[in-house]
């Protein structure tokens, strides 16, 4: 078990709460505002301490480059299967179909708010600027109700993607968090589209 100071625990809980509320990690300035620090530099020092203790990982060059570290162990065969990890989604199958489940991870669903129903294995770098990297596990709450600005898992035809959601009338714009990628524009009147879930957190495995 990681031993944290009271202030380090506060910072870690703030990160978890922010991810639960928005689907992506906070910046140093946002942590400082929430906890009443005088400057983002104070938040940075606590983040470095959390990183050194293995509670988080920090990505250089990204303002939201904070990731919670999955330290759960699956070594005990008596453990429950845990939440399913969705790998490549097979065309024509519901996202939680057995054909799509690559594995399970023993992480409590109620670690996230709203609670996670499954994890999606992230492929690609279109969301890297908010700390969602290839190979990460994206915690997803299964819902079809989302708001503009939230990070969603969406299905366009037979393809599943993770993007920031914006809708105006019958036009949906799926926005990447990487300037190398273009927005995806969907016309609901002529294209097949569905919301598969809401991002409620992101975890990197194996550290």
Curated annotation (Swiss-Prot):
Q: Where is the active site?
A: 126, 163
The record's top EC class is: hydrolase
Reaction(s) catalysed by this chain's protein: Hydrolysis of Ala-|-Gly bond in repressor LexA
Which one Pfam family would you cite for this protein?
Peptidase_S24
Query: Which molecular-function annotations from GO does this UniProt entry contain?
Result: DNA binding; serine-type endopeptidase activity
Site (Cleavage): which residue positions?
91-92
InterPro entries associated with the record: LexA (IPR006200), LexA-like (IPR039418), LexA/Signal_pep-like_sf (IPR036286), LexA_DNA-bd_dom (IPR006199), LexA_repressor (IPR050077), Peptidase_S24_LexA (IPR006197), Peptidase_S24_S26A/B/C (IPR015927), WH-like_DNA-bd_sf (IPR036388)
Function, in words: Represses a number of genes involved in the response to DNA damage (SOS response), including recA and lexA. In the presence of single-stranded DNA, RecA interacts with LexA causing an autocatalytic cleavage which disrupts the DNA-binding part of LexA, leading to derepression of the SOS regulon and eventually DNA repair.
The text of the family note is: Belongs to the peptidase S24 family.
Write the protein's name: LexA repressor
**Lineage, top ranks:** Bacteria, Pseudomonadati, Pseudomonadota, Gammaproteobacteria, Oceanospirillales
Protein's gene: lexA
